[in-house]
């Protein structure tokens, strides 16, 4: 029975005397055993290290047997070793998630009794904070019931009263928690206590305990060590400590304060128990840190923190410590990877002998693995990965959301997209079945894709999913004016809907009907199996194993195991309680989100990446400490516990020597120099301290004060680590290259710089490129280098390919041709490649326009059919007629969207009001005008299965024709004694004016084409040849009127519905357009006015809207030529990226859905807008009238 302290600074190899003592103890007696106790996070590495060093010391065959009597454990593993067959381990120990359930249950039951913490159960993280405080108090050997009497006296000040009330709540919660936990098993803190009690009854005289890697212990761990010192044959305690503290505590500002305090505590415990204390062994011979510079850094840091005289830097060699400042985070990691690769290739290091330390893994994680992969460096990131990103967690969250929000479509799609809901026959895990499963999964995935499109297009939510009736829907193409075949879509989307409807409603009902937690857990478990979740995870695991992704396979297995454990613990805690579905959902969502995967390195020879706080002296031969900025080193520490620093200090002042709470925030901040000391001593041969000068969005990031102090006090250079430039010499350039894959990136950057600077590459780089092109990676390099000369210019399609794409004859509409002139690539994408955006539920502009057109068409057809004159109807008759039309249209399946929600019902009302207002205006217009409507919705050309009057058929250069189709909304006729005139009316749901420039450039071909067709087929339309009246727009809307307008309401309203467009400058026509006009008046219907001399003429500033017959003829001829020009370019394979730009408006790109396809970027010199020159009417007419036939199809 004895205890001995093994001391030394980080330079000393404290493990050497421990291994020697272990060997000696094992050799003394065949019954002797050794338990090596280390922190859990280094147990794996320490076990390998201890066994290796022990093997090196053994010299005979018999000696090698001694290692079987050596165990490397953590304290909790030691508890399992001794207590596994005792009642303490006979019951299942609840996990942290199970303990959180008990806390939740207590908080709900005791809510009315709580004062400070009432209602805190709904605060995110509160239960975790509560559990952490409980564990802290148990580990600190503190019974809360003992504290409360003292705290009752702390009522002199408000803070004392708050602390008393807080502990009143905590006493209630923790007392009930302990009572409940006694029914289920012992939590970890209790296990240590029971181990201490158990070991007092065990003969440990043949056992030596070696304790290493700790600097401080919890109160219960100290009690356990006290038992070990009293019972064991020998106890060795290794502490990173510069001197002994047998009688006095160290100065709180000391670098080794924590270790010194631990030394003092253990020394005093041994003295009190009269346990022999052997002389300290201070290691001075065996050196852990072998590089003299790093030894000097160790001494410097101790002296600077202990305020001792500074060191001399005269003997500094400069081969062990390197300070880097990188241009940014990416360059920092790139240079680290390059240096690692160099160390391995040139200096013989192994990857496992190198570690990367950081305190900001969130910043580096996304870049680290890809960059290291480029450099072909195997890496292991020692970080617990949360389960919250696993599809199973998403599946559970979306399942609960479906119930909470009644089949909201985004929740249903989230649920389906996890691909865990796949009800199918259970498959065996054989190679054949994996192929079968993949085929089934792909088929299911396709059905889900189709279902998603259907749901987005039709807005299926709520009862649409739970009803037994299958979905029935129509799909109407408003442009082509035809109904699409949706039989396959209906069948496949309904297959998905039926699967959900068969399982989900009954599951939710069963859960709601469950009486107890056990009953609900049983329902949930069976639903997991019925849904195919267990099978899917099993197949995912098998698929990952087949692909060699062992970590992914383990994650799938661990996630399922975690869910099953959570379910078991839920039954343990809530099994006999009344079931509450809301609590059940909260427990399982938060329970899985808080869990982490346990990780094991998948390969031995890997670079280790870990947190700075978890390192230890001499952990690796080479250490890269990255991200050494002032933001995180020293770390800014906040108190996020339930007790403030002041409250902690108050409590600590009342505790006995064997009780304590963890230190305050100030104490943790004071420990930061010690963390830095561990980082600086973590490397045995080389240490690299690096930081980025730019991080995220922060510019001019400052280095850590520790970094600056080392650089200044030791007079060390800071090496700049930047991107390669074309001006770098060969030595500097070589520092950027470690593999052929990285060479591709460097050469790409340099070639781009050469292009920008016109500087030549060094011969060194040309030789490197030549060597690269002889490697297997050459095809990738070639592809990347080609990107430097790539221009975002679409290739012209061969005419042989264009014909099967578009046909020999082109059947088109006016809007399609206008699209071609807006941007040829847009036309190619939509009508060549047939790309189309997914339909999204709602009333589209096309559907709105179709609604208005259909309503007005039926309105006039009823008038014509009933041989009624609109001008003769009363307002009431007009209103009744409009109502009849609306009732007919709103029952049409094309507009069923208008009945799907309250919002849509309101839109329906607004559309109806608009039609009624327009009907009112049409009546007033008919009373004032000589124009009468003779036909509506006049088809020309072939539209779907319908064939109308003759459309335009124009010749193309390939001997084919371009066939133009369309639908004229309305044709009006005006008959005078001298002539018959035809005019076309086009309804627009937005305000539109005829623009001569747009017509000239092919951007507005509709009105000229419609008028051309009407005149061409006049005999068929009105029974005789007719003269043109014009093409006019009618704005279909429900106008807002000015309250203070000088005109009366009717005049204001008619002004809002005034026709706008192109009119003939024909006196006979103008005299009869508005029969209500009087001298010195402007028409409310047309852009005309009557002069004082009773002469009808174009209105003020309206001249550009009027043309003569020769001018109209030129416009119509030019319009036809634009069709021919576009048709010839289309069949010729022209695909230019030339979006039109007029004035300050990007008319082609503004609403274009293909921007992500064409990648048009005005910053690229090869991408330019087709800028539309604004021309006056006179300029256009001069060009058209003076143009000879040879240039008739050319654009200026």
Swiss-Prot record:
Its cofactor is Mg(2+); [4Fe-4S] cluster. Its EC number is 3.1.-.-. Keywords: 4Fe-4S, ATP-binding, DNA damage, DNA repair, DNA-binding, Exonuclease, Helicase, Hydrolase, Iron, Iron-sulfur, Metal-binding, Nuclease, Nucleotide-binding. One of its GO terms (molecular function) is 5'-3' exonuclease activity. It is an enzyme of class 3 (hydrolase). Binds 1 [4Fe-4S] cluster. InterPro entries: ADDB_N, DNA_helicase_suRexB, P-loop_NTPase, PDDEXK-like_dom_sf, PDDEXK_AddAB-type. It comes from the Bacteria. SUPFAM superfamilies: P-loop containing nucleoside triphosphate hydrolases. GO terms for biological process: double-strand break repair via homologous recombination. Despite having helicase-like domains, this subunit does not have helicase activity. This is ATP-dependent helicase/deoxyribonuclease subunit B. It comes from Enterococcus faecalis (strain ATCC 700802 / V583). The lineage of its organism: Bacteria, Bacillati, Bacillota, Bacilli, Lactobacillales.
């Amino acid at each position: 029975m004895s205890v001995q302290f093994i001391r030394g600074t980080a330079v000393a190899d404290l493990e050497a005397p421990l291994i020697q003592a272990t060997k000696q103890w094992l050799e003394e007696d065949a019954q002797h055993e050794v338990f090596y106790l280390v922190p859990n996070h280094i147990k794996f590495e320490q076990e390998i290290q201890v066994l290796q060093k022990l093997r090196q010391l053994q010299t005979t065959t018999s000696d090698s047997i001694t290692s079987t009597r050596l165990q490397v454990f953590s304290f909790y593993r030691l508890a399992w070793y001794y207590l596994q067959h005792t009642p303490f381990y006979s019951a299942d120990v609840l996990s942290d998630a199970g303990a959180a359930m008990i806390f939740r249950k207590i908080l709900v039951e005791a809510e009315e009794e709580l004062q400070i913490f009432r209602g805190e159960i709904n605060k995110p993280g509160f239960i975790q904070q509560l559990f952490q405080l409980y564990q802290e108090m148990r580990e600190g050997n503190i019974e809360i019931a003992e504290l409360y009497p003292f705290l009752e006296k702390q009522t002199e000040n408000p803070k004392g009263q708050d602390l008393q009330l807080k502990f009143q709540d905590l006493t209630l919660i923790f007392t009930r928690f302990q009572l409940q936990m006694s029914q289920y098993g012992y939590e970890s803190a209790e296990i240590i206590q029971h181990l201490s009690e158990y070991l007092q009854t065990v003969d440990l005289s043949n056992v030596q305990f070696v304790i290493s890697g700790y600097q401080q212990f919890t109160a219960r761990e100290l009690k356990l060590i006290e038992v070990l010192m009293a019972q064991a044959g020998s106890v060795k305690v290794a502490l990173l400590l510069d001197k002994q503290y047998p009688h006095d505590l160290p100065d709180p500002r000391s670098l080794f304060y924590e270790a010194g305090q631990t030394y003092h505590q253990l020394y005093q415990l041994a003295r009190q128990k009269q346990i022999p204390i052997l002389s300290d062994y201070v290691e001075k011979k065996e050196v852990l840190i072998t590089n003299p510079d790093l030894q000097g850094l160790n001494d410097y840091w101790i002296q600077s923190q202990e305020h001792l005289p500074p060191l001399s830097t005269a003997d500094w060699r400069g081969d062990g410590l390197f300070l880097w400042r990188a241009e940014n985070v990416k360059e920092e990691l790139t240079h680290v990877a390059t240096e690692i690769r160099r160390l391995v290739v040139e200096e013989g290091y192994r990857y496992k002998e190198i570690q990367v330390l950081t305190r900001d893994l969130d910043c580096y994680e996304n870049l680290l693995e890809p960059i290291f992969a480029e450099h072909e460096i195997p890496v292991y990131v020692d970080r617990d990965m949360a389960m919250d990103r696993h599809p199973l967690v998403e599946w559970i969250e979306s399942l609960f959301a479906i119930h909470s929000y009644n089949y909201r479509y985004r929740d249903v799609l989230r649920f389906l997209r996890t691909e865990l809901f796949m009800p199918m026959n259970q498959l065996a895990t054989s190679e054949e079945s994996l192929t079968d499963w993949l085929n089934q999964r792909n088929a299911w995935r396709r059905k889900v894709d189709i279902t998603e499109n259907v749901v987005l297009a039709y807005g299926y939510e709520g009862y649409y999913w739970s009803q037994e009736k299958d979905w029935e829907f129509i799909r109407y193409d408003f442009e082509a004016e035809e109904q699409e075949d949706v039989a396959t879509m209906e069948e496949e989307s309904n297959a998905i809907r039926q699967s959900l409807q068969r399982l989900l409603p009954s599951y939710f009902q069963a859960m709601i009907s469950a009486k107890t937690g056990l009953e609900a857990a049983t329902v949930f478990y069976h639903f997991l199996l019925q849904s195919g979740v267990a099978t899917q995870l099993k197949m995912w695991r098998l698929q990952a194993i087949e692909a060699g992704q062992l970590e992914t396979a383990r994650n799938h297995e661990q996630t399922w195991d975690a869910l099953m454990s959570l379910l078991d613990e839920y039954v343990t805690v809530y099994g006999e309680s009344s079931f509450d579905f809301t609590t059940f959902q909260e427990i399982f969502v938060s329970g899985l989100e808080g869990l982490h995967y346990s990780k094991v390195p998948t390969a031995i020879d890997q670079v280790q990446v870990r947190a700075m706080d978890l390192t230890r002296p001499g952990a690796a031969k080479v250490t890269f400490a990255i991200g050494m900025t002032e933001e995180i080193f020293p770390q800014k520490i906040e108190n996020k516990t339930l007790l403030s620093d002041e409250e902690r200090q108050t409590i600590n002042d009342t505790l006995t020597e064997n009780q304590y709470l963890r230190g305050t925030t100030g104490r943790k901040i004071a420990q930061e120099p010690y963390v830095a000391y561990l980082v600086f001593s973590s490397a045995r041969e080389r240490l690299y301290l690096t930081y980025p000068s730019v991080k995220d969005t922060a510019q001019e990031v400052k280095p850590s004060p520790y970094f600056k102090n080392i650089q200044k006090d030791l007079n060390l250079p800071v090496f700049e680590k930047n991107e390669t430039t074309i001006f770098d010499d060969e030595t500097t350039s070589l520092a950027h290259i470690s593999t052929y894959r990285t060479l591709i990136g460097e050469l790409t950057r340099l070639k781009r710089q050469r292009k920008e600077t016109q500087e030549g590459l060094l011969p060194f780089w040309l030789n490197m490129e030549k060597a690269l092109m002889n490697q297997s990676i050459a095809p990738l390099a070639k592809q990347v280098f080609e990107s430097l000369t790539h221009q975002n210019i679409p290739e012209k399609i061969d005419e042989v390919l264009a014909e099967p794409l578009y046909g020999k004859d082109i059947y088109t509409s006016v809007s399609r041709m206008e699209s071609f002139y807006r941007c040829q690539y847009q036309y190619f994408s939509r009508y060549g490649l047939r790309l189309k955006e997914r339909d999204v539920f709602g009333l589209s502009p096309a559907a709105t326009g179709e609604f208005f057109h259909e309503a007005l068409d039926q309105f006039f057809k009823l008038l014509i059919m009933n041989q009624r004159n609109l001008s003769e109807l009363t307002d009431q008759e007009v209103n009744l007629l409009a109502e009849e039309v609306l009732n007919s249209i709103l029952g049409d399946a094309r507009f069923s969207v208008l009945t799907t929600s309250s919002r849509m019902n309101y839109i329906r009302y607004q559309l109806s009001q608009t039609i009624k207002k327009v009907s009112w205006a049409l009546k007033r217009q008919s009373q004032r005008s000589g124009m009468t409507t003779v036909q509506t919705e006049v088809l020309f050309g072939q539209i779907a299965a319908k064939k109308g009057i003759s459309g335009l058929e124009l010749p193309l250069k390939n001997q084919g024709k371009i066939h133009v189709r369309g639908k004229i909304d309305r044709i009006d006729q005006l008959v005078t004694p001298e002539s018959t005139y035809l005019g076309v009316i086009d309804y627009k749901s937005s305000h539109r004016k005829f623009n001569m420039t747009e017509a000239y450039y092919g951007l507005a071909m509709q009105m000229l084409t419609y008028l051309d067709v009407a005149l061409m087929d006049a005999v068929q339309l009105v029974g005789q040849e007719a003269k043109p009246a014009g093409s006019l727009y009618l704005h279909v809307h429900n106008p807002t009127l000015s309250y203070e307008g000088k005109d009366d309401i009717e005049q204001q309203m008619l002004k809002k519905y005034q026709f706008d467009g192109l009119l003939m400058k024909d006196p006979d026509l103008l005299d009869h357009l508005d029969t209500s006009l009087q001298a010195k008046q402007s028409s409310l219907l047309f852009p005309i006015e009557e002069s004082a001399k009773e002469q009808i003429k174009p209105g003020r500033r309206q001249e550009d809207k009027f043309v003569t017959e020769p001018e109209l003829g030129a416009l119509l001829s030019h319009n036809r030529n634009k069709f021919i020009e576009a048709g010839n370019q289309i069949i010729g394979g022209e695909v230019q990226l030339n979006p039109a730009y007029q004035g300050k408006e990007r008319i082609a790109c503004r609403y274009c859905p293909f921007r992500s396809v064409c990648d048009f970027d005005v910053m690229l010199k090869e991408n330019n807008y087709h800028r539309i020159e604004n021309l006056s009417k006179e300029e256009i007419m001069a060009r058209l009238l003076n143009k000879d036939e040879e240039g008739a199809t050319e654009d200026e």
